[in-house]
């Protein structure tokens, strides 16, 4: 009798979903307002000045959805029995209240009812990682930290690719 070595899928207890760059289009709005990519503004040492203005004018409340986000959210809502939660950064502790408030308004506007979790910087996301949890995030360092902490990380580039990878786990 032949035995095969079949890899078992881990039972996933929670999927954590980043907002900016995955569901909400931060970069598009930033470019519309400041005529440059956020990374370019960082290189020119102008990011914080613009980011403060971005927050003061409540831009997080009205960001557009990312391409494919509607389909991605639909899949997470209707086709999975795995709970999904939002895990989003507020950049730092000083900006925590303003950004988390704006992001809650954004979630409500888009009828996204997943439990929201906000952390005062992306470097704190790994604290939610467990071997049976998945994070979907567009930041490589977040994915690296998540995996080092024992979780499963999906580096989001687009929703078609992300859903293809996610379906291997759920």
Identify the role of each PLM range:
Residues 134-166:
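Acidic, Mg2+-coordinating phosphoryl-transfer loop and its flanking beta/alpha structural elements
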Residues 61-64, 69-100, 107:
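Substrate-recognition element of Asp-dependent hydrolases with the DxDx(T/V) motif
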Residues 2-57, 148, 158:
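Active-site neighborhood of HAD-like aspartate-dependent phosphohydrolases
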Residues 81-82, 112, 151:
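Short phosphate-binding/catalytic loops that engage adenosine nucleotides
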Residues 126-129, 165-170:
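Short amphipathic alpha-helix with an adjacent loop that forms part of the alpha/beta core around
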Residues 88-133, 140-143:
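Substrate-recognition "cap/lid" segment bordering the active-site pocket of phosphatases
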Residues 74-77, 104, 108, 144-147, ...:
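Class I S-adenosyl-L-methionine
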